[in-house]
Amino acid sequence: MKILETERLLLRGLEQGDFKDVCKLLQDDEVMYAYEGAFNDQEVQNWLDRQFGRYRHDGFGLWGGGEKGSNELIGQCGITYQEFDGKRVPEIGYLFKKEFWHKGFAIEAAVACREYAFHTLGFEEVYSIIRDTNIASQKVARRNGMQKVATFIKHYRGV
């Protein structure tokens, strides 16, 4: 089901049939360095299950992104609730296959998600939680109108 459309992308809800394509994304060490390493098959399934739960409970989550005119899943972008400063906040997250890095897909998707968060979901503020070493993602966030509000440590895998 299509959620958002941009000039070059379609963002849609993920389905179980996307498992192999999601594996190509989440099992790439270079793509997943900000998450402290690539996922194994079970971790990919757990990640998918979390998205399905988010769709049901929140009405949104991380969506699959594909180029218009192609069925290939090139990344994911969307809105999830994350814990920050003792509260639950909406976060815009994005992750794309490395062959699609530095081509403007992340900012295109992130801007669409920001607009959706404000105008469709009615949020008054959104966040992007980004690893301090992920300079490219920080640049995307700044181009998306984000401002740094805090620095903190978040562990994804106990590292």
Place the predicted regions along the sequence by residue.
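Acyl-donor (CoA/ACP) binding surface of acyl/acetyltransferases
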Residues: 1-33, 66-159
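Secondary-structure boundary/capping residues
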Residues: 31, 40, 57-60, 126
